[in-house]
């Protein structure tokens, strides 16, 4: 369940949710529908306190001009839930997916708890994969597709799906992955040298070396 939100800023105390878009994909990242995009009219106070950077961003995208024609939070949540239930009627099945989606989820926790309650507690965050690629496979990271969503929710979430499609194509094999035997072997190697035990052993080695130098 791919979701992207636009807000008047990042403060849960002062800022408002002003746009939400949803695209549903299958497990192979094929979109099942063209998606839904809803504009939410925020309190005037949230618009007035908007910072210059965010105001310029939403002016350039056209979102600021569209805000007076939006709907309420309650209606937006009802529309999104109705849309999602067409594809995933049972609660707790579909994970929330997106890009740096923790920020979006914070606002949805506050403003659309019924929506969050319908989703699975696990999250698929493309930004996590991107950060791993930057460290482990920099060529894949630096050649990733350019993003031109323009800070509108539906375009941004479509680009997030495409971004994961790209990373899947370059970082994961097209077949079914390792055999069960290979996977079990790798798991045993990790279990034989867990992170904390390896750290403790390294510290012991360093301490012994330091003690030898002090003699």
Enumerate the language-model features and the residues they cover:
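Active-site-proximal helix-loop-helix substrate-binding element of RNase H-like nuclease domains
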Residues: 42-45, 52-54, 126-162
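Conserved non-catalytic scaffold segment of RNase H-like nuclease domains
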Residues: 1-3, 7-98, 145, 196, ...
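Substrate-recognition/cap helix-loop segment adjacent to the acidic, metal-dependent catalytic center
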Residues: 86-88, 103-122
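Alpha-helical packing segments of well-folded alpha/beta enzyme cores
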Residues: 76-80, 104, 160
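Short conserved catalytic/interaction loops centered on acidic-Pro-aromatic/His motifs
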Residues: 116-120, 140-144, 172-179
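Acidic two-metal-ion nuclease catalytic site recognized across multiple nuclease folds
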Residues: 147, 151-215
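Conserved beta-strand scaffold positions in the cores of enzyme catalytic domains, especially
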Residues: 96, 123-126
